[in-house]
Amino acid sequence: MDDTLNQANPSMSRRQLLNFFTGAIVATTASAAIYPATKFFMPPAESTDAEGGILAQDKIGHPIPASQILAQASGTRALIAGLAGEPTYLTVREDGTLDPMGIVNNCTHLGCTFPWNPVDQQFQCPCHGSRYDAQGSVERGPANRPLKLVQVQVKDDYIWISPWQETDPRTGEKPWWV
């Protein structure tokens, strides 16, 4: 008499089952290690609105509430991270609102960043001495083009920065950066 059980076709042997579970554990562990490494090398997605604008951020990437800048005195120029992280000046107007025209803080001569001089009421590039007026028009070279502009909008205490597409109000022409 035969005491063995007749198994016609077992669907999976014990060894195959253990190999499957081992492979699943290795794949899960590898995925868990690769995901953060991939996220590290990918730039963070910027919050955008319907017009292609992004939220104004501070230098470490936190959104800046409009109330924080509007609490400053009129004429104050706040430096924020704008489109593509470009440093951008926002101006508080006399009526307590933000100027809808932001000025990108990159000299059109060689791309240096520069401070606003409140005494002279000018942007002064320290690299080669270019001077720009309060609206970003060239007052003294070697730069020969006005500073790049961006559109500024406040919606629900958030500041949205979007590319300037209209005619440059300083020159009356199509912007050179479009």
From Swiss-Prot:
UniProt cofactor(s): [2Fe-2S] cluster
GO biological process: photosynthesis
Keyword match Transmembrane: yes
Residue intervals of the Rieske domain: 61-161
Annotated GO CC locations: plasma membrane-derived thylakoid membrane
EC number: 7.1.1.6
Oligomer and partners: The 4 large subunits of the cytochrome b6-f complex are cytochrome b6, subunit IV (17 kDa polypeptide, PetD), cytochrome f and the Rieske protein, while the 4 small subunits are PetG, PetL, PetM and PetN. The complex functions as a dimer.
NCBIfam families per the UniProt record, alphabetical: Cytb6fFeSPetC (NF045928), PRK13474.1 (NF010001)
The protein's name in its UniProt record: Cytochrome b6-f complex iron-sulfur subunit 2
The species this protein was found in: Nostoc sp. (strain PCC 7120 / SAG 25.82 / UTEX 2576)
